[in-house]
Amino acid sequence: MTTRVAARRSAATLRGGIICESLKPGTELEGYELRIIRWSRYEIRDPAPWQPSVWTLIEFEAPADDSDSLAHRLSKDLAAPGWYANWNTAREAVVVFPHKIFRYKRGDSSGRETAKEYGRHCGVPEAQLDWDD
């Protein structure tokens, strides 16, 4: 694969994570071209009172064209309080909370802080506001 093709492919792909326990019962993510990169379970040291102490994280890739529809879907399917999902494209970071979506240029500290502030307002523990962008 040439560098140009690889760059085009990475620019056209989003990569992120969804914690299974953050989804409302009955959630189905059908119709998206999600490709699971890793499926892992791990213990959380200091979960919030409403969070379980063991989480299942699905790390995934999908076509960047699915970013908007996936964000809108997850904004309806994430449980409240205190959960979010996030992903990045080559240029953009996307953070999805219940009923609220944040998009900002990767590396934009102001955009990141706006999303983190909203997360704090929604009850996400500070230590969990640690997504990569």
Describe every region a protein language model picked out.
Residues 102-133:
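Acidic, proline/glycine-rich low-complexity IDRs
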Residues 3, 7-53:
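N-terminal, charge-rich interaction modules
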Residues 3, 43-45, 87, 109, ...:
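Sparse, context-dependent recognition of short Cys/His-centered cofactor- or disulfide-binding micro-motifs
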Residues 26-28, 68-70, 129:
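Short acidic, gly/pro-rich beta-turn/loop elements at beta-sheet edges
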Residues 35-106:
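Short, intrinsically disordered low-complexity segments
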